[in-house]
């Protein structure tokens, strides 16, 4: 470790007596990774909800992710690489966000007192985002690891099997609320922080963005619950012990 690094770590300024730009750079990367994950969250919800349109529609979309228009039957390993990339961004975002978390009881008490006294909506939203982010770090990691290591088990039949027979439904139910709340709040706070849509009336814009955030949360949660119900219903109907439901979708597209 150089003397310059030691000086900056204690004083917060560079050897040139300038305030360190590192916090700003880390904030930018936190925002960038958060934006990517927020948009991915929306796309992911629309993907998994294709089961509401029928098995064939979801299977068709699944195979497009596996590049079946290039490889006959598709290559599940393509999904593994995609999941690994998202997992890496997910971990990086969590690492960057942890800088803002209260790290001891005193900091937690200070924040809680501030939140309760101020009763400011955006402060409460930050707290919701922090709590849902904490839950997502564990629940989301489980889901992403499964997608990364078992991509051939994605599909209307196989995913329903995982949901019910492999008892993933409690995790997915909690993850649904955590992801949709965290993502919608995060996108709202990004827009406010960077002033993307401020225009000439920032206060009015912020109020409209908050309404949009609420509508987004409600829409995605309702869509998610309908999708969740569809998977559970299909999973409960899988009662034939002679059928390999876990790899059913993979086998019917790779063994003809």
UniProtKB/Swiss-Prot annotation:
InterPro entries for this protein: Fum_red_B_TM (IPR004224), SQR/QFR_C/D (IPR034804), SuccDH_FuR_B_TM-su (IPR000701)
The UniProt record lists the keyword Membrane: yes
Cofactor(s) recorded in Swiss-Prot or TrEMBL: heme b
SUPFAM superfamilies: Fumarate reductase respiratory complex transmembrane subunits (SSF81343)
Record's cofactor remark: Binds 2 heme b molecules per subunit, called the proximal (bP) and distal (bD) hemes.
Binding-site residues, heme b bP: 93, 182
Effect of residue 182 to A: Loss of fumarate reductase activity
Residue intervals passing through the bilayer: 31-52, 77-98, 125-149, 166-188, 207-230
UniProt GO BP: tricarboxylic acid cycle
One GO CC annotation: plasma membrane
Signal sequence coordinates: none
Stretches of the chain found on the membrane's Periplasmic side: 53-76, 150-165, 231-256
Pfam family, one: Sdh_cyt
Residues in compartment: Cytoplasmic: 1-30, 99-124, 189-206
Location relative to the cell: Cell inner membrane
Keyword Transmembrane part of the UniProt annotation: yes
Binding site for heme b bD: 44, 143
GO molecular function, one term: metal ion binding
Keywords of this entry: Cell inner membrane, Cell membrane, Electron transport, Heme, Iron, Membrane, Metal-binding, Respiratory chain, Transmembrane, Transmembrane helix, Transport, Tricarboxylic acid cycle
Membrane topology: Multi-pass membrane protein
NCBIfam families attached to this UniProt entry: PRK13553.1 (NF010072)
Subunit structure: Part of an enzyme complex containing three subunits: a flavoprotein (frdA), an iron-sulfur protein (frdB), and diheme cytochrome b (frdC).
Cited function: The fumarate reductase enzyme complex is required for fumarate respiration using formate or sulfide as electron donor. This subunit anchors the complex in the membrane and binds a diheme cytochrome b.
Family: Belongs to the diheme cytochrome b FrdC family.
Protein name stated in the entry: Fumarate reductase cytochrome b subunit
Organism field: Wolinella succinogenes (strain ATCC 29543 / DSM 1740 / CCUG 13145 / JCM 31913 / LMG 7466 / NCTC 11488 / FDC 602W) (Vibrio succinogenes)
Name of the coding gene: frdC
């Amino acid at each position: 470790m150089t003397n310059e690094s030691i000086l900056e770590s204690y004083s917060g300024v560079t050897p040139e007596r300038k305030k360190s730009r590192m916090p700003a750079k880390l904030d930018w990367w936190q925002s960038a990774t958060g934006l990517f994950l927020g948009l991915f969250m929306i796309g992911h919800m629309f993907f998994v909800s294709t089961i509401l349109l029928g098995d064939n529609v979801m299977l068709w979309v699944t195979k497009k992710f596996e590049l079946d228009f290039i490889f006959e039957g598709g290559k599940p390993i393509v999904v593994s690489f995609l999941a690994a990339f998202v997992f890496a961004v997910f971990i990086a975002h969590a690492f960057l966000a942890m800088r803002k978390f209260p790290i001891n009881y005193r900091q937690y008490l200070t924040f809680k007192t501030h939140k309760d006294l101020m009763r400011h909506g955006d402060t409460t939203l930050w707290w919701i985002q922090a709590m849902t982010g904490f839950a997502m770090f564990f629940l989301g990691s489980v889901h992403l690891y499964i997608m990364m290591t078992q991509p051939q088990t994605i599909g209307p039949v196989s995913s329903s099997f995982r949901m019910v027979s492999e008892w993933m439904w409690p995790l997915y139910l909690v993850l649904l609320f955590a992801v949709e709340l965290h993502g919608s709040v995060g996108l709202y706070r990004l827009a406010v922080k960077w002033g993307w849509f401020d225009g000439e009336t920032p206060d009015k814009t912020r109020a409209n963005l908050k309404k949009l955030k609420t509508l987004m949360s409600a829409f995605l949660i309702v869509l998610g619950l309908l999708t969740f119900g569809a998977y559970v219903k299909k999973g409960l109907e899988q009662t034939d012990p002679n059928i390999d439901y876990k790899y059913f979708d993979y086998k019917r597209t790779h063994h003809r």
